[in-house]
């Protein structure tokens, strides 16, 4: 990783897939995925508003940015989308949020159990956001994008999706899981965490989506935040199921 905690980094994580990590501690992930026709790369998720320039630069090194596919439309995932000048797609259940003002009605930040985090998120959410996104088209469960299958993983957001590639058992899963405790963002508390209920549209559905991810038996999970998680498929399945069953960390 770069020594500057704000400097974006780009790394290849799999065939035709690059992780572009930016913003604070390189904690916001945008995945650049090669288009099958060789026309460039598309972005899965769009990070924060401040990442627009670095996303464009990284994509240009890989043939150019063709489109954005939102894993979901929270402000730290849609942030740069209005600035990138390419078509933006999302799940039908996420269009309203993507085109809205960035105020998520189902996230009562006052209920975050760690006091400093309540204030921190209130400050950074408006900074991360780039404003409403004009959605060009929608994508749904079972559709295919550049060799990946769209998987609906609702709960954290109603229209959250992942991209699954069976050939190497790779899942780009947006915020289906966190690999640190999001209620304590100033520290690093490694583990597999379903998003805290305060961040979810439907906490029970979130756990069902974690189990759905587990059932895929991935060998690599590429989340919306932190570095990818790699392992034996059976072991990752066990760990994901345990996280859903125990809601690890809460």
Language model feature labels by segment:
Residues 103-108, 220-250:
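C-terminal/domain-terminus segments
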Residues 119-146, 200, 204-212:
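Alpha-helix-centered segments that form part of catalytic cores
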Residues 37, 60-64, 143-146, 166, ...:
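Glycine-rich phosphate-binding loop signature in dinucleotide/nucleotide-binding domains
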Residues 17-23, 44-48, 65-68, 148-152, ...:
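Short, flexible loop segments at the rims of nucleotide/cofactor-binding pockets, characterized by
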Residues 50-137:
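Active-site HxH/HxHxD metal-binding segment of metal-dependent hydrolases
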Residues 42-44, 69, 88, 170-172, ...:
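Residue-level marker for buried hydrophobic side chains located in beta-strands
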Residues 6-60, 163-179:
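Conserved beta-strand hairpin/beta-sheet module of binuclear metal-dependent hydrolase folds
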Residues 48-49, 141, 149-154, 158-232, ...:
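Metallo-beta-lactamase
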């Amino acid at each position: 990783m770069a020594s500057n905690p704000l400097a974006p980094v780009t790394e290849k994580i799999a065939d035709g897939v690059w992780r572009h990590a930016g913003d604070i501690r390189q904690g916001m992930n945008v995945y650049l995925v090669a288009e099958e026709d060789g026309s460039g790369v598309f972005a899965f998720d769009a990070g924060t508003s401040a990442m627009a320039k670095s996303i464009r630069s990284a994509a240009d090194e890989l043939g150019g940015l063709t489109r954005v596919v939102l894993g979901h439309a929270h402000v730290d995932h849609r942030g740069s989308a209005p600035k990138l000048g390419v078509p933006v797609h999302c799940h039908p259940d996420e269009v309203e949020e993507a085109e809205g003002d960035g105020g998520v009605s189902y996230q009562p930040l006052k209920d975050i159990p760690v006091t400093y985090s309540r204030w921190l998120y209130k400050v950074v959410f408006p900074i991360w956001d780039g404003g409403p996104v004009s959605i060009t088209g929608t994508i749904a469960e079972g559709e295919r994008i550049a060799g990946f299958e769209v998987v609906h993983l609702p709960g954290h957001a109603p229209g959250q999706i992942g991209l699954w590639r069976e050939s190497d058992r790779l899942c780009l899963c947006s915020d289906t899981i966190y690999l640190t405790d999001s209620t304590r963002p100033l520290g690093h508390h490694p583990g597999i965490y379903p998003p805290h209920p305060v961040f979810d549209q439907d906490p029970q559905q979130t756990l069902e989506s974690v189990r759905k991810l587990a059932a895929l038996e991935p060998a690599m999970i590429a989340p919306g935040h932190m570095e990818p998680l790699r392992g034996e498929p059976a072991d990752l399945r066990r760990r994901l199921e345990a996280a859903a069953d125990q809601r690890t960390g809460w």
